Structure formats: structure tokens, C-alpha cells
């Protein structure tokens, strides 16, 4: 259309007599047979005062062809190019402002008429733009047809998935029931296996405790009369109960339940549990009789002298606030080393049996393992079906979203939905994924920064689909969240052409796409080369 408008003046323009600097559209105001009325109506003057180099009208309309009025306008006819208004102050200023040179009629300089050359270049540009529009619109129609077909296919696929979903849901429920049925004997067999193992552990532990108690009884029974007396018990001051470092006769008698002595059976039942953790053997632990192999059986702990009560949490916090970590470590070591004045030297650290295979639960028997394998197979089938159902539900959601999305009046922008486009500048790589997000990352590497996620179409009311808005990107330091407006321009290819930041944290991106090409106007043939000017 612009090309036609440019060509029409060349074909049909006729010379109309008018004062210098007056346009064809205003020539009827300048009738030399009548007085001239200022265009703003401020005054009327004789016509011979028009262009007399003296400003009579407030709006400068009486001096369109001179520089007398600072607010006047001079019209450049520019035949062969585009007409132009310039300020009257530029008339005869020694600078060629009109391509036809008519503004310098009395300045003494000669202006070359460049209008035809400019018109030729302008027409070439307009022709190229028209070609881009025609080709882009042709591609746009293909995109529209492609989306119609793709949309129909997606709708069919959606119907198939929705039908398949019901079948898969039923399958999942069947497999869930089979899994639960298979897990019942599995759990029962595993519980029985664990219970038998724990019972064996308890028996082994009881046996070991009796052996330890018997060994301690033999050590305490100095006269080997088959009983432990108060005096024999007093030979072990570590059994002190009042913290004075010695086991008094009364304390020993209390430990023996008020009796003067006690045989081995009563010693295990009544005394051993009370002294077990304090008692220190008089022989090395290696001289104990070896324990029978049993799971989860540990060597008895050797007795240690009484330790001071550990500090409370509040005391610990106070110490942390007042002292350094190194001081606390030293205090802990000191507190562990404190002993009553009359206490015997500290005993070696208690030794425990090293972990062995017997300490671990034994492998499942063949029948239990068979139950486990069957249940695991049922679980695997159920989980696989459940994953398939979740994948199908995700596919259904994606299809529903894509089918219902607003891709333009005829779906011409749908092809952008699954694409991303990049623009590399000196500092950043900008990435646009239409209908999803915009981001930037440093060219030399680094994490991407979100410039916004899809918000809405953002063009004016008469051209809604000419711009996109992406919002709620990464927040700027002490500023708003980043956002991006994407202007859609007509082009034969889809490419990001520019990215700028006109306002802080607000970006402007331009995307060329055939989908933005308008329908070109019909082409009217131009008959011959009738340039009457």
C-alpha cells in the first residue's frame, strides 16, 4: 500500500499554481484574488503581503516560503519522493533540507535534486518489505493449516489417552490388590523369621549373662564355700553406693538383700543386676570363658568407678557462651578423669565382643524368600503400572493445555509452543521459549536469570497478538521482578532480532515470525511510466 501511495503522485500529479512553500492540500487558502486570512483566523491581510518576508500572522501562515516567521512551515514538494514539511527558519539558511532543493531558492547555493534517487531506494525498500509480507503471509497460511491438522490429531490422541486411562486405572487397582495379597504372607513370614531370631538372641543373651554372673560369683567367693559373704563383697570398693570410695559393711549387706551371705542362684537373681555395671573383674577379660556363638551377644562391660553426673543442657549452653570450644574439650577430659580420693585406679575400658555373622539376622529360609520374591514381583508390576498411569495423566494434561491454548485468531502461533530461540550479544545469551519463559545467562558461562514466565498477550486492543508479556522473573536488587515484552514482527524466518532494557528490570525483545505477517493488499498494475512532472 505504501508503494502504491508513493507511485500515485508520480503518475497523476498536475501542477497547481500556489505560493512558494504551500502544499497542494492548503493551496485553496491562498487565493491571490482575495485577501489572505491567517489559518488560525487571527487576522486578514492583502494577498500581496504573503511571502513578503514580514510576519503578519501569529501562526506564521502568511510566510510559508520565507524565514520571517519562526513558527512557520515550509512545504517541500519533493517530486519523486515523499513530501515534507520543514521549519520556515531553515529556508535559505544555506543547508539543503528538501531533496528537490526548493528551500534554498535565494541562498546562493545550488542544491542537487536527489528526490528521484531517494524515491528509487524507497521503492526498493518498500518492494522488499512487500515481498517479505507476501512470503510471510504465505507461510502463515501454511502454519494455520498445519495447526488445524495437528490440533485434530492431538484431539484424537487425547480421546485415545482418556480411554486408555480408564483401562490403566482398572489395571492399577487389580495389581494393587495382587500386591497387597502377596505382601500378607511375605510380612507374616518375615515377622516369624524376625521373632525366632529375636528369641534366639534373648536366649543367648540370658545364657551369657548367667556365665558372666557365675564368673563374678566365683571371683567373689574367696573361700570357695559356695556363697558370697558381706566381707567378700567389700573387697570390691567399686561397688560403693554412697560415693565415698569404699563399700561399707552396711552397703554390702544392703546389696545382699539384708543377708549375711548369698549362694549362686540368689546372687544371679537378686544381686547381679544391681552390681553388673560397676563390677570389675580381677582377671583380664581374655581369661573369661568363651561365649557360645549367638547373635547380638556382646562381651560384658568392665566396671568403672562412679562418674560425676553429666551437666544439664542449660549448663552446657552456659559453658558454650562463656568458654571456647578448646576449653570445653579440656573440661570434658578433666571431668571424665575425676575419681574419688580413695577410689582404686581406673580400670581398663570395657571390651565388647567384635561384631560377627552371628550378630546379624540370618538369611531368610527358602520358603520366606519365595514369599519375598513373589511380593517384590507384584510390587514391581504395580509400580510400573502406576508410573505408566502418571505418565499418561501428564500427557493428558499437556494435550488439554495445548489444545485449549490461545495461539492467535487462527492458531498461527502454535508452532512456537515447543520451540526456543536464542540471541547472543557481547555480554549475554538471551533465550526465548514462547508461551513458557525468557532468560539470560552470561556469555562466558554462569547460571541463567529468569526474565519472566508467560503471562498473556499484550498488544493493543486492535492488535492483541502483536506482543507477548512475560512476568515474575528473578527479582532485581532492591527493585521489581524482571519482566519482558516481546514484540512480534513480520518476517519470513523465525528469529530473535534484538533485546534491550529500556527501563530497569524491564526488557524489550523483538521476534520476527511469519505468524505476525498481515494479509498484503491486492497488487494493482501500473500502466506505463507516466511521470508528467
UniProtKB/Swiss-Prot annotation:
Pathway(s) of this molecule: Glycan metabolism; N-glycan metabolism
Biased composition (Acidic residues): 312-336
Residues the record lists as binding Ca(2+) 1: 49, 52, 54, 56, 62-63
Principal location listed in the UniProt entry: endoplasmic reticulum
N6-succinyllysine PTM sites in chain numbering: 165
Protein name (Swiss-Prot/TrEMBL): Glucosidase 2 subunit beta
Chain positions with Phosphoserine modification: 23, 88, 167, 388, 395, 439
Residues glycosylated per entry: 71, 481
Domain spans labelled MRH: 418-519
Keyword check for Disulfide bond: yes
Binding of Ca(2+) 2, residues: 93, 95, 97, 103-104
Gene3D superfamilies for this protein: Low-density Lipoprotein Receptor, Mannose-6-phosphate receptor binding domain
Domain LDL-receptor class A: 36-70, 71-112
This protein's record includes keyword Hydrolase: yes
Amino acid at each position: 500500500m505504501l508503494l502504491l501511495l508513493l507511485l500515485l503522485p508520480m503518475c497523476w500529479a498536475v501542477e497547481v499554481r500556489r505560493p512558494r512553500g504551500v502544499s497542494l492540500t492548503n493551496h485553496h487558502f491562498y487565493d491571490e484574488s482575495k485577501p489572505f486570512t491567517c489559518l488560525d483566523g487571527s487576522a486578514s491581510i492583502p494577498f500581496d503581503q504573503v511571502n513578503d518576508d514580514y510576519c503578519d500572522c501569529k501562526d506564521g501562515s502568511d510566510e510559508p516560503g520565507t524565514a520571517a516567521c519562526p513558527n512557520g512551515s515550509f512545504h517541500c514538494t519533493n517530486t519523486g519522493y515523499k513530501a515534507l514539511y520543514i521549519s520556515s527558519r531553515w529556508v535559505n539558511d544555506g543547508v539543503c533540507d528538501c531533496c528537490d532543493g526548493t528551500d534554498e531558492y535565494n541562498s546562493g547555493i545550488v542544491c542537487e535534486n536527489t528526490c528521484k534517487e531517494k524515491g528509487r531506494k524507497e521503492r526498493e525498500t518498500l518492494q522488499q518489505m512487500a515481498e517479505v509480507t507476501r512470503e510471510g503471509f504465505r507461510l502463515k497460511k501454511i502454519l494455520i493449516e498445519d495447526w488445524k491438522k495437528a490440533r485434530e490429531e492431538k484431539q484424537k490422541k487425547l480421546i485415545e489417552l482418556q480411554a486408555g486411562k480408564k483401562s490403566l486405572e482398572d489395571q492399577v487397582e487389580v495389581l494393587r490388590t495382587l500386591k497387597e495379597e502377596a505382601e500378607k504372607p511375605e510380612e507374616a513370614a518375615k515377622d516369624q523369621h524376625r521373632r525366632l531370631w529375636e528369641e534366639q538372641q534373648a536366649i543367648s543373651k540370658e545364657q551369657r549373662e548367667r556365665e558372666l554372673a557365675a564368673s563374678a560369683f566365683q571371683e567373689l567367693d574367696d573361700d570357695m564355700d559356695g556363697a558370697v559373704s558381706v566381707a567378700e563383697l567389700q573387697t570390691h570398693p567399686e561397688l560403693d553406693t554412697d560415693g565415698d570410695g569404699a563399700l561399707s559393711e552396711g552397703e554390702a549387706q544392703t546389696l545382699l538383700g539384708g543377708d549375711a551371705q548369698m549362694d549362686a542362684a540368689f546372687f544371679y537373681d537378686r544381686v547381679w543386676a544391681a552390681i553388673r555395671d560397676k563390677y570389675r573383674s580381677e582377671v583380664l577379660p581374655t581369661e573369661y570363658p568363651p561365649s557360645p556363638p549367638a547373635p547380638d551377644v556382646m562381651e560384658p562391660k568392665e566396671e568403672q568407678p562412679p562418674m560425676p553426673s553429666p551437666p544439664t543442657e542449660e549448663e552446657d549452653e552456659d559453658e558454650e557462651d562463656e568458654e571456647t570450644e578448646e576449653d570445653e574439650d579440656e573440661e570434658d577430659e578433666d571431668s571424665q578423669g575425676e575419681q574419688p580420693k580413695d577410689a582404686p585406679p581406673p580400670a581398663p575400658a570395657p571390651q565388647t565382643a567384635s561384631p560377627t555373622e552371628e550378630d546379624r539376622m540370618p538369611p531368610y529360609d527358602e520358603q520366606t524368600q519365595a514369599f519375598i520374591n513373589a511380593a517384590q514381583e507384584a510390587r514391581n508390576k504395580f509400580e510400573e503400572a502406576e508410573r505408566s498411569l502418571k505418565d499418561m495423566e501428564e500427557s493428558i494434561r499437556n494435550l488439554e493445555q495445548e489444545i485449549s491454548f490461545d495461539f492467535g485468531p487462527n492458531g498461527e502461533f502454535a508452532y512456537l509452543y515447543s520451540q526456543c530461540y536464542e540471541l547472543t550479544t557481547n555480554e549475554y545469551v538471551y533465550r526465548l521459549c514462547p508461551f513458557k519463559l525468557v532468560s539470560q545467562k552470561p556469555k562466558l558461562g554462569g547460571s541463567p536469570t529468569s526474565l519472566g514466565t508467560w503471562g498473556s498477550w499484550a498488544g493493543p486492543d486492535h492488535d492483541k497478538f502483536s506482543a507477548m508479556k512475560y512476568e515474575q522473573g528473578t527479582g532485581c536488587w532492591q527493585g521489581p521482578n524482571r519482566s519482558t515484552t516481546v514484540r512480534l514482527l513480520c518476517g519470513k524466518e523465525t528469529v530473535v532480532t534484538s533485546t534491550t532494557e529500556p527501563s530497569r528490570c524491564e526488557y524489550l525483545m523483538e521476534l520476527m515470525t511469519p505468524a505476525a505477517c498481515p494479509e498484503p493488499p491486492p497488487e494493482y498494475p501500473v500502466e506505463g511510466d507516466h511521470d508528467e512532472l
